[in-house]
């Protein structure tokens, strides 16, 4: 069995990690922290976990308690996660960080996009990006994994195959994406209160959302990214627009064939002609994609739907950990969504 620690287990991504660990045949949760909830039973905060973790109590972080664990997930704010990873390196087997602390390879981007100076830029080269569909081999045996942002997962799975195969012009790509409110985290905020989000649909982070440079880093495209908040709990739908590469004349069929071929052996990517829906991915680790070419306007359109807490965060983290540890990549993860 793989001994697992979840640092920051009291947040939504932490609770999702616990849910997935409960069904994982190789994971045994040995340690779960939640400093603001230290002393609180996990089942008290999240009754959905009562069947699997009736006696688990969130603890305050103690490096000695974490030492020797095979696998540690970090579900903390970026700067806290950065310092935690440094403290745990060499004391635990594999670290999977769900924050952005190690996602960007260029340390100069952190002050502009995240508002802090990266104090350990030497670790950015060591960290392996945790999106198996686009970099599986690098993950094998990795000891420090940076999992993608939720929007980045959806946009990158949609765009990267087309950029890599030379099907679209990488300049001037537009990504419009909408997310459920759980992406904002468990802490109460004025802009995520029920009365604020109910019956509302709003854009935010105009021209400066922090996932922009990450999408560009992963896809190799220049991106104008606009996120939106939708009054639902979970899910992301990304709609991406690009011009065809110079000298190419795509069709809807050729785009679907390209995506289908690129992801033919992927257990968690579904390519269909039908438009994807977030509800179809709910609770699963799947990404649902489709594509179109509009002859009238000359645009390529690619859509991707995921569950932001599953494939977009905790599910993707478990998938990356499975690859790093040499386990069955699909262990603990569902490829069928919940409906209705």
Tell where the protein language model's regions lie, with residue ranges.
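C-terminal active-site/capping subdomain that shapes the small-molecule cofactor and substrate pocket
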Residues: 241-340
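A short coil-to-beta-strand element that immediately follows conserved catalytic motifs
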Residues: 29, 170-175, 224, 268-272, ...
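Electropositive phosphate-/nucleotide-binding environments in soluble metabolic enzymes
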Residues: 11, 78, 125, 152-156, ...
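Short glycine-rich or small-residue beta-strand-to-loop segments that form or flank ligand, phosphate
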Residues: 3-6, 146, 239-241, 302-305
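N-terminal Rossmann-like NAD(P) cofactor-binding subdomain of oxidoreductases
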Residues: 1-204, 292-296, 339-340
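Alpha-helical scaffold segments in soluble metabolic enzymes
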Residues: 16, 20, 157, 161, ...
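Contiguous C-terminal substrate-recognition/catalytic subdomains in enzyme active sites
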Residues: 192-284
